[in-house]
């Protein structure tokens, strides 16, 4: 039997839309015959997956957890909230997180080729097996893995997930409440940056120019010199930083202090420094353009078969 080349497997994968390992196995079992391999996949119930691969998967869930001391956040998409709320999909997402924590894959492609956490097959195999049950297009969209002291937060069954990384000598248990409070702040207000020092200088300059132009159009500033207007605007940038930077934001549970001040107060109580080192926020379906179906047309299509 001729060897099955990587290019042949890739070509077959592009033609069918099925998983890499499934395509390779189908070709091996059928001695490289594409037509027989397609029949093989159809018999396994996998070929229909290719037809659904182009359908928009904008539902699903964002998930965050700490697994064996490793922080993981991942977004997995499917087509309907019905499937997203089911136990099989939730188990798959949880399993994906376990694999990410253990295997530390470089990207999604590498993740899909990793061994499944049960020891049976790969992540791609597990996804294909789930497809046979739910019959929906699914995709592991993105993930982050952090080896540090992390606190996870999942909002509304996976609509938003947040992973906060803290730097401290305090125990994970001691900073759990703080981390959760900060994560809830991130979830609700979606800050663009951790701290004002992280805001690119070009963005600050652009905001400054916009505010100066706006101020000059205000009749109250008609007689003020440009230098005075600029000074007023620069002084007002602090308010802008409070809107876009996590640590400068008013703390949601006590808006008399900033998040940074609240963290400092907790650190003082614990008797050891605590720093918010970073965070990741995933919102389910963020940036995915959902298909807008015409219900009447869809029903008519179903009736016609």
Predicted segments — roles?
Residues 2-305:
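N-terminal assembly/interaction segments in proteins that build large macromolecular machines
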């Amino acid at each position: 039997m001729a060897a099955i080349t990587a290019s042949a497997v890739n070509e077959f994968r592009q033609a069918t839309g099925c998983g890499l390992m499934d395509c390779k196995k189908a070709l091996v079992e059928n001695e490289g015959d594409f037509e027989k391999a397609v029949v093989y996949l159809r018999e396994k119930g996998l070929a229909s997956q290719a037809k659904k691969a182009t359908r928009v998967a904008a539902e699903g869930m964002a998930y965050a957890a700490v697994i064996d001391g490793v922080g993981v956040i991942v977004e997995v998409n499917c087509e309907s909230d019905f499937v997203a709320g089911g136990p099989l999909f939730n188990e798959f997402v949880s399993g994906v997180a376990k694999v990410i924590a253990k295997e530390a894959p470089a990207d999604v492609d590498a993740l899909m080729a990793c061994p499944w956490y049960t020891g049976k097959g790969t992540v791609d195999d597990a996804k294909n097996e789930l497809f046979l049950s739910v019959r929906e297009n699914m995709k592991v969209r993105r993930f982050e893995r952090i080896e540090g002291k992390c606190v996870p937060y999942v909002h509304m069954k996976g609509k938003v997930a947040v992973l906060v990384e803290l730097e401290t000598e305090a125990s994970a248990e001691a900073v759990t409440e703080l981390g959760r409070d900060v994560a809830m702040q991130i979830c609700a207000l979606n800050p663009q940056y951790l701290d004002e020092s992280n805001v690119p200088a070009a963005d600050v300059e652009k905001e400054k120019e916009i505010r100066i132009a706006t101020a000059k159009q205000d009749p109250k500033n008609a007689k003020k010199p440009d230098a005075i207007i600029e000074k007023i605007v620069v002084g007002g940038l602090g308010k802008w930083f409070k809107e876009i930077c996590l640590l400068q934001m008013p703390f949601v549970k006590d808006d008399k202090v900033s998040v940074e001040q609240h963290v400092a107060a907790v650190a003082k109580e614990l008797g050891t420094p605590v720093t918010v080192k970073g965070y990741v926020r995933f919102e389910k379906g963020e940036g995915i353009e959902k298909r807008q179906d015409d219900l009447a047309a869809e029903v008519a299509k179903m009736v016609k078969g």
